[in-house]
Amino acid sequence: MGAETQPAEPGVRDLAEVDEPAFTGLAQRHRRELHVHCYRMLGSFEDAEDTVQETFLRAWRRRETFAGRSTFRAWLYRIATNACLDLLAKCRPEPATGGEVRWLQPYPDRLLDELPAAGADEPETVAVARETIELAYLVAVQHLAPRPRAVLILRDVLGWPAKEVAELLGDSVNSVNSALQRARAGMREHLPAQRQDWTGDETDTRTRELVRRFTDAAVAKDVGALAAMLRDDVRCSMPPTPGLQIGRDAVVSDWIADGFESLGSLRAVPTAVNRQPAVAFYLWQDSDGAYLPLTVDALRVTGGAITEIVTFHADQFPRLGLPERLPADRTP
């Protein structure tokens, strides 16, 4: 894989005399990319938010240690990575049997759009930025031990040289290279063998049409039509709720057992998370006289079929910028 590229950073030499407002202004330029970095490390939007705040606090307190030997951006990444490792050392959750990552949270595309633009003339760079934020990648990377995880993200996603990663982690270059090989092997174990099976399709006309048909069938509660869009080995999960369903029959049986066909009136709003198509569903509530948030389905589409559905609970709607309610436009 190639690595993400970033625009050149204006020189920052001496932070000792910088006041807090000026320092905050410098740091805030990098907030979104640091947040995405912490999100890759932790798999949780909320934990990433807390860790970025901790990063800025540590950076302000240690500003006199910045000697200008690296860029200010690299210095912040160093602090952020160590803050993530500290958090994981305190309370590292273990993926459940079968590969579930119950703390996984979605990342809104509207916030990913705030990232500095990767080189449009470098297709591999653009692909890395997209693929390494998709949910399948996030789930796989959470299975790695924290330090190999950090090495993988710094080397393969951000493109840091092994020497700089070694300095950040206080390891030798040989140790970093060994950790990278272990991390890559772990990713191969937890990702499908074929790259297109875990990256999904680009959002092309065929994918958009499939998502539209999925949305229509879900609103109609047409289980047969939904089943026809699933690949035989489809995976379905709903973090943080336990339970990973694998295979079309298992997924459909779970829908039926959960009473999907007897739900009340539904409405849907298209959205996007983690550079994947998603659909937000709303359920009619008589007591409120409106459609209220139900779930968000993030879809992975490969070869014209749905290969994974990750369903998130209604508490994610505000972060995704989705409406709190939808008005009645017909008699439910």
Describe the role of every protein-language-model region.
Residues R13-V36, E46-E49, W60:
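A short, charge-rich alpha-helical start-of-domain segment used by transcription regulators
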Residues A162-L168, V173-R267:
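Solvent-exposed, charged amphipathic helical/linker segments at domain boundaries
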Residues V252-P332:
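Low-complexity, glycine/alanine/valine/leucine- and proline-rich hydrophobic stretches
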Residues V151-L152:
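A short pre-motif secondary-structure segment
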Residues L34, C38, L76, A80-L88:
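Hydrophobic-face residues of short alpha-helical interaction/recognition segments
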Residues L88-D109, L191-T199:
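Short, basic/polar amphipathic helix motif occurring as a linker/hinge flanking DNA-binding modules
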Residues E17, M41-F45, E54-F72, D86-E94, ...:
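Sigma70-family region 2
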Residues H35, F45-R62, Y77, L158:
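Conserved RNAP core-binding helix
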